[in-house]
Swiss-Prot record:
Signal peptide: none annotated. GO terms for biological process: DNA recombination; DNA repair; SOS response. It holds the Pfam family RecA_C. This is Protein RecA. ATP binds at G65, P66, E67, S68, S69, G70, K71, T72. It is found in: Cytoplasm. GO terms for cellular component: cytosol. Keywords: ATP-binding, Cytoplasm, DNA damage, DNA recombination, DNA repair, DNA-binding, Nucleotide-binding, SOS response. Can catalyze the hydrolysis of ATP in the presence of single-stranded DNA, the ATP-dependent uptake of single-stranded DNA by duplex DNA, and the ATP-dependent hybridization of homologous single-stranded DNAs. It interacts with LexA causing its activation and leading to its autocatalytic cleavage.
Length: 352
């Protein structure tokens, strides 16, 4: 760049800073680039499929799928993982269907969970915005977009037509809260339902509710489906689940993860680790027996998973080996740096 252009750019930057404040425009090379902080989903395979070890903080995420596919279970699992790391979480229950007992079984600390059951869609989104702007909440779940009913529709007659009202509401709300979410470094997850488009001859007839705004504003979109049943004898004890990363602005999209959701227990993490361990050579399988680092840990997947549940230090070691191998070096380095920082903060607090 020649001297005249440099002077003109410096003058423009100076004027922008005086008018809009310091940091309104900056060079990307002025600061060290850091990996995007993430919150685990509770599924190791899904964390790896997302590419950064979980769902990104400071972003909007959409999770959609058919009924009884595990949407709410997945979000409650995210809350449980976030609470383990000391995060503050909120659940905006527009469907008025949250079961505290079930949430507790999945590992959620229901005593510390903030819950709102709003009357209208406007109220739900306003509460979400206020929680984000407080800078004190780390994870917010909105369940669900389909239940965000505009006030005009609630106060109107049953047969009244309200064309595009919900889509306009979502578009306006997302324009307003997106910037606040980034500044607060808060993860906001919208659960959505599926509808069928009429008269579609080619391609998928499926679409999500609430218009197109959420599709654009979401950094990550997850399509969750139930693919089969988990049985113990003749009794169905859970469901086989597949999650596809349909959109991903923070890593490569279109990856898939498959795991089991056990009724009353949630995501079957130990069983998932056994499967991934065998696939990537950390766990040896000989006939029905499984061995880890030369030691037999169980006959059959269920017994091997029980061994991991009874020996959390072995489970933690296997999980670390899988994450180190399957996640990018930048993500691992950033997680180690944050762990070191937390240790230093704890030591500083102890000194005080």
């Amino acid at each position: 760049m020649d001297d005249n252009k440099k002077k003109a750019l410096a003058a423009a930057l100076g004027q922008i800073e005086r008018q809009f404040g310091k940091g309104a425009v900056m060079r990307m090379g002025d600061q060290d680039r850091q990996a995007i902080p993430a919150i685990s989903t509770g599924s190791l395979g899904l964390d790896i499929a997302l590419g950064i070890g979980g769902l990104p903080k400071g972003r909007i995420v959409e999770i959609y799928g058919p009924e009884s596919s595990g949407k709410t279970t997945l979000t409650l699992s995210v809350i449980a993982q976030a609470q383990k790391a000391g995060a503050t979480c909120a659940f905006v229950d527009a469907e008025h269907a949250l079961d505290p007992e079930y949430a507790g079984k999945l590992g959620v600390n229901v005593d510390d969970l903030l819950v709102s059951q709003p009357d209208t869609g406007e109220q739900a989104l306003e509460i979400t915005d206020m929680l984000v702007r407080s800078n004190a909440v780390d994870v917010i779940i909105v369940d669900s977009v389909a239940a965000l009913v505009p006030k005009a529709e609630i106060e109107g007659e049953m047969g009244d037509m309200h064309v595009g009202l919900q889509a306009r509401l979502m578009s306006q709300a997302l324009r307003k809260i997106t910037g606040n979410i980034k500044n607060a470094n808060c993860l906001v997850i919208f659960i959505n339902q599926i509808r069928m488009k009429i008269g579609v001859m080619f391609g998928s007839p499926e679409t999500t509710t609430g218009g197109n705004a959420l599709k654009f504003y979401a950094s990550v979109r997850l399509d969750i489906r139930r693919t089969g049943a988990v049985k113990e004898g003749d009794e169905v004890v859970g469901s086989e689940t597949r999650v596809k990363v349909v959109k991903n602005k923070v890593a490569s999209p279109f990856r898939q993860a498959e795991f089991q959701i056990l009724y009353g227990k949630g995501i079957y993490l130990n069983g998932e680790m056994i499967d991934l361990g065998v696939l990537h050579g950390f766990v040896e399988k000989s006939g029905a027996w499984y061995a880890y680092e030369g030691t037999k840990i169980g006959q059959g997947k269920a017994n091997s998973a029980k061994f991991l549940a009874d020996n959390p230090e072995v489970a933690a070691k296997l999980e670390k080996q899988l994450r180190d191998k399957l996640l990018s070096p930048a993500v691992i380095a950033d997680s180690k740096a944050s762990a070191v920082k937390e240790t230093e903060d704890d030591l500083a607090d102890a000194d005080i």
